[in-house]
Regions:
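Positively charged, low-complexity intrinsically disordered leader regions
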Residues: 1-52, 56, 124
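Active-site cofactor/substrate anionic-group-binding motifs, chiefly glycine-
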Residues: 38-39, 43-91
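Glycine-rich phosphate/diphosphate-binding loop of Rossmann-like nucleotide-binding domains
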Residues: 44-57, 140-219
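Short, structured coil segments at secondary-structure junctions
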Residues: 61, 91, 111-112, 168, ...
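Anion-binding alpha/beta catalytic cores of soluble intermediary-metabolism enzymes, centered on
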Residues: 93-164, 259
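Rossmann-like adenosine-cofactor binding region
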Residues: 192-272
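Adenosine-phosphate binding glycine-rich loop
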Residues: 254-255, 261-301
């Protein structure tokens, strides 16, 4: 069964899904294509954008979503993931899961007879990356000759961006302190994609080097859910990696600022930047809806 657990799963369909999202957003797709379809939405972690966008997306496509927290499921009381997958497959047409551990999503998909869509794990955030690239295409018109720089902790969002950027012909750099580099396995695959598409991936602890010739500056929170015990150390280690106007001025003229939200103003980004004219963060947030509608259409229709 085809599922979306990683950008790697849609290596050949990335451009198609983004273009489909543009058509759906413009109202150029048939009305209510998922009428009668049901999506189970499992949340092991709290969410604003993921929950609302998937719920609204299913409704607008003619289907419905069922919200399931860990406390709603026997899985939260020890039922094997395999049993949960097999049973839910008898009731619904697809499963979206926002999980703590990536392996839980892999196992769910292994035993599911319906498509499984990752709404975030500790390793990747493919839906966010698709929404981000939809935003980039809307803003610049194409991905040609564009470069994105991720500043800060090389986390799950960074991992998905590293995979999707070269597939669309974009260069990508990561600026992070030592010890906060992206996943090595992800970097290996990203470099393979870059070689196939004549693009470049770089990782550096030097922000000035990473921001050279950059059109998109992207950051995320320093302390993600689950990292609270490391809060003080993370804030210390990442203190020189705040995206402020001085950093934005290093990027190319016309560069945009991106953030997947929620944001902590005064930490990973200054209020001046996130609330300024170069920021497209609310376009990104809205595009979660349109990108995920394209994903739902692709997997459930």
């Amino acid at each position: 069964m085809d599922s979306l657990l990683s950008i790697c799963d849609i290596k050949e369909e990335v451009s198609y899904i983004i273009d489909l999202a543009i058509k759906i957003k413009a109202g150029e797709v048939e009305d209510k294509p998922l009428e009668g379809k049901t999506l189970a939405m499992i949340f092991q972690k709290s969410s604003t954008r993921t929950r609302v966008s998937f719920d609204v997306g299913m409704y607008q496509l003619g289907g419905r979503g069922i919200f399931l927290s860990s406390s709603d499921l026997q899985m939260g009381r020890g039922e094997p993931i395999s049993d949960t997958a097999k049973v839910l497959s008898r009731f619904v047409d697809g499963i979206m899961i926002r999980a703590i551990e990536h392996q839980d999503v892999v196992e769910l998909a292994k035993y599911s007879d319906v498509p499984v869509i990752s709404g975030l794990t500790n390793l990747e955030h493919p839906c966010q990356a698709l929404a981000d690239m939809l935003t980039v295409k809307e803003h610049f018109g194409s991905f040609e000759n564009k470069k994105i720089c991720f500043v800060g902790d090389g986390n799950n969002v960074c991992n998905s961006l590293l995979l999707i950027a070269p597939l669309l012909g974009m260069d990508m750099s990561v600026a992070c302190p030592k010890g906060y580099e992206p996943c090595e396995d992800i970097l290996k695959i990203a470099n393979e994609y870059a070689n196939e598409n004549n693009t470049e991936i770089t990782v550096s602890d030097n922000i000035n080097v990473a921001l050279d010739n950059v059109d998109i500056v992207y950051t995320d929170v320093w302390v993600s859910m689950g990292d609270e015990a490391e809060k003080a150390q993370r804030e210390k280690d990442l203190s020189h990696y705040q995206v402020n106007q001085k950093l934005m001025d290093i990027a190319n003229d016309g560069a945009i600022f991106m953030h997947c939200l929620p944001a902590v103003r005064g930490q990973e980004v200054s209020a001046e930047v996130i609330d300024g004219s170069q920021s497209v963060v609310y376009d990104q947030a809205e595009n979660r809806l349109h990108a995920q509608k394209a994903i739902l259409y692709h997997y459930l229709k």
